[in-house]
Amino acid sequence: MAITEILPGIHYVGVNDRTTTRFEALWSLPMGVSYNAYLVAGEKIALIDTVEESFGSRLEANIREAIGERKIDYLVVNHMEPDHSSSIAALRRIYPDIEIVGNAKTLQMIEGFYGIAGGTVEVKEGDTLDLGGKTLSFHMIPMVHWPETMVTWCAGDRTLFSGDAFGTFGALDGGITDSQVETDRYWDEMR
């Protein structure tokens, strides 16, 4: 799936995975899974979440397609589950000056999982990050479904980057917003 401009300055740069057959070795993935990552660009650029590390080169290609050779200033980590975070170390190698943004629990987990300390920005409930033309705010939603989970809100664009809070399994097949996704397959599960 190619990158998609959601709104001016906001791009979906995630990746579809049609090869993984089970999530956490338990749940079947007959329709694949998407690893959702987003770029928010003002004067500075933030990447929100990453992808599973074996798809890191595709993420890098998507990023470059969206922003060319501009650097990413911030990596916002909403959720530490490896399908969201396991490309962090690779991104740090590509963008050595990137600052990793997360709450206290997230930053502890990044150090524990990936050995990365330093070059971080700790955020608390309601803190903001000004990208120059776009402002992100951070809101904690612990235990949805890990203890460090947070969401990121871009108020000027009225856009919520929700991590797993409203997620579902399945590759996106070109649809990013709910009006673009075929929902018939989900009705039985919702009942």
Go through each PLM region and give its residues:
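Active-site metal-binding motif and surrounding structural segment of the metallo-beta-lactamase
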Residues: 43, 54-101
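Short, flexible loop segments at the rims of nucleotide/cofactor-binding pockets, characterized by
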Residues: 23-28, 51-53, 77-79, 136-142
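Metallo-beta-lactamase
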Residues: 4-8, 101-191
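Short, conserved acidic/polar surface loops in the N-terminal third of protein domains
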Residues: 59-60, 85-90, 111-114, 149-150, ...
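Short, structured coil segments at secondary-structure junctions
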Residues: 94-96, 116-117, 155
